[in-house]
Amino acid sequence: MAYNLSRMTIYAMVSAIEEDLREIIRSHLGSKSTSDKSFDQALLDRAKIRLEKDNSYGYDSDTLASLVDYFDLGDIYQLINSHPDKFPKTISDEIKLRTKSLQALVPVRNRVMHIRPLNFNDLPLVTDFCEELIYSSPSTWINVTNTVSHLKADPSFVLGLSIPREGLNNEA
């Protein structure tokens, strides 16, 4: 299925944001047990169900690292905000500062992934947000930095990407 340049550019940038946020969780909470009651058990249960559905086998691990790929975008930043003491202060402060912007990305992400019509301001909103992340801390936002650099060098590279079909059925 062919998609337009704007949709694929947004897809690349939002995917990079999600990858970086997941890596933040893996780096700082990945070894934590999913049985730790300080974590939202409903979130963990949803992620376990998604993992089992995707892989046709039962969940047999006990760490957050094994589930982080099955968290929604909104769940990822909420998890970081819920446990600021588990992250370096610079990261927890930045996520808290950028929570409203991350919340604004969720409907954009859903429009892209579910092949809904884009709003006229979706691309500039995501582009500006990525530039802010890079300006604030390029070492934290490695995937975002690399993706934006790649886009600046060759904007058409996104036309070779594909939006995973399974992404069409999941909300962020």
Residue positions per predicted region:
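Amphipathic alpha-helical interface elements
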Residues: 1-172
